[in-house]
Curated annotation (Swiss-Prot):
It comes from the Bacteria. SUPFAM superfamilies: Phosphoglycerate kinase. It is found in: Cytoplasm. GO terms for cellular component: cytosol. This is Phosphoglycerate kinase. It is an enzyme of class 2 (transferase). HAMAP family: Phosphoglyc_kinase. It catalyses: (2R)-3-phosphoglycerate + ATP = (2R)-3-phospho-glyceroyl phosphate + ADP. The keyword Protease does not apply.
Length: 393
């Protein structure tokens, strides 16, 4: 780890501004429905509190578009965090302003203050220097523990570091270490499973994985585009017609052999609303007007045989329309294969994590990345703005 972390600085008696990712779902009663992201940052919070710091937490929630919207208030998160930490968590109804500044000055070691949704302010996503300065005025030290937003140059992820000493939290440190090792010194065989709808979303990471992985297994809608680039008729399946040349370029870059491994059969149906009519067919035998919605059983076996001997596995993106019963088998079966592998297993992306949970194997993977877009940018070799601004060791 080339960046300083909270272990490298004096925290006793300090007010510490921690950027976290509490972008969590609520249930119909307005309570936190899934506290995974809150639990992920607890080690950082506990380390700071035990070390004699007062903690000021800032996060976004949803997309309020730069204005107050009570549907996206973080107040319910304060209640959940209080339960998880067994401490009173104070809540500031404004992220900045005289009342919040007064509340921050009154904090004693061991106190926690959660600010209201940072994206209620348009200046946040604009990385406004004045807004960043007002956030910095609340604290003595800045900590980024929000890997999921580290690829964004916002006031609370980048701009604030111009005004305070800036270091990484324990969650961010773990993400950078694990994902960094994934590409620098992976134990081999290294197998990557990449799904999702579009090649265009993942061109950079596909290029990098072709160079680094022993096998790159492709699923989801993007597999259709690769198959179409090889000349297969995918009928009504999702295909990015404007990315066929990109797919051919990636296949050529991989060279002969099966470094890029594509489906040999697919689960097809007349449309997504009729899974009961599904059939498994070879990729060259899709009925006219039908579309692919999942990997076929032969492909699942092929991919499982690539994954089982692996010593390092990275998975991003479901391989089918797993949220629809009948089109979920490929994703869930491969989730269980990955979880059972004697390998370092890293999964990332919101849909992928949801699939692993649905398969009941979340606790069996080595690392669940808290950042979808951020993990892909890092694996591409791109510098993350929220990491670049942190102090070097």
């Amino acid at each position: 780890m080339l960046k300083k972390t909270i272990r490298d600085v004096d925290i006793a008696g300090k007010r510490v501004f921690v950027r976290v990712d509490f972008n969590v779902p609520f249930n119909e009663r307005g309570e936190v429905a899934d506290d995974t992201r809150i639990r992920a940052v607890l080690p950082t919070i506990e380390y700071l509190l035990t070390g004699g710091a007062a903690v000021i937490l800032a996060s976004h929630l949803g997309r309020p578009k730069g204005k107050r919207d009570d549907r996206f208030s973080l107040r319910p998160v304060a209640d959940r965090l209080s339960a998880l930490t067994a401490r009173q968590v104070r809540f500031a109804a404004e992220a900045v302003g005289p009342e919040t500044e007064a509340a921050s000055r009154e904090l004693a070691p061991g106190d926690i203050l959660l600010l209201e949704n940072i994206r209620f302010y348009p200046e946040e996503e604009q990385n406004d220097p004045e807004f960043a300065s007002r956030l910095a005025a609340l604290a003595d030290l800045y900590v980024n523990d929000a890997f999921g937003t580290a690829h964004r140059a916002h006031a609370s992820t980048a701009g604030i570091a111009a005004h305070l000493p800036a270091v990484a939290g324990l969650l961010l440190e773990r993400e950078l270490d694990i994902l960094g090792r994934l590409l620098s010194v992976p134990e081999r065989p290294f197998v990557a499973l990449i799904g999702g709808a579009k090649i265009s979303d993942k061109i950079g990471v596909l290029e990098r994985l072709i160079e680094k992985a022993d096998y790159l297994l492709v699923g989801g809608g993007m597999a259709n585009t690769f198959l179409a680039a090889q000349g297969h008729n995918l009928q009504a399946s999702l295909v990015e017609a404007d990315r066929l040349e990109t797919a051919r370029y990636l296949l050529a870059k991989a060279g002969p052999g099966e470094r890029i491994t594509l489906p040999i059969d697919l689960v097809v149906a007349p449309d997504r609303e009729q899974p009961e009519k599904r059939a498994t067919v070879a990729v060259e035998s899709i009925p006219a007007g039908w579309a692919a919605f999942d990997l076929g059983s032969g492909t699942v076996r092929l991919y499982a045989n690539r994954l089982r001997p692996a010593r390092t596995i990275f998975w991003n993106g479901p391989v089918g329309l797993f949220e629809v019963p009948g089109f979920d088998r490929g994703t869930l079966d491969l989730a269980r294969v990955i979880a059972a592998a004697e390998a370092t297993t890293v999964v990332g992306g919101g849909d992928t994590v949801a699939a692993v949970k649905q398969a009941g194997v979340l606790d069996q993977v080595t690392h669940v990345s808290t950042g979808g877009g951020a993990s892909l940018k890092l694996l591409e070799g791109r510098e993350l703005p929220g990491v670049a601004v942190l102090q070097n060791r």
